[in-house]
């Protein structure tokens, strides 16, 4: 099982690659990361650019919001990545679509990738401010 949440627009501007957990400036990401550590679960971030990213994976700064038009291609990338790490269940932490409609492409991508791989997906909505 892995806890997963989507990336954030707020990032630390850096010329060098940083571990994903340090790049994203998001209370939601930090909270889910800490919950995963507390519960002994793997933690993943769903990036609009990189797909599935481990918390400690170094990535470069980017500014990209996943769009509906990109979901099909993004889904293929995410499915390949999930398959490679052999995840059987994903718990996806997200804001409600009513609160943040920009989450929908991320939800669509992770949902389709999990469906393709027959991986269980549990979505947990929270009152996140980012």
Label the model's feature ranges:
Residues 1-130:
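Peripheral peptide segments
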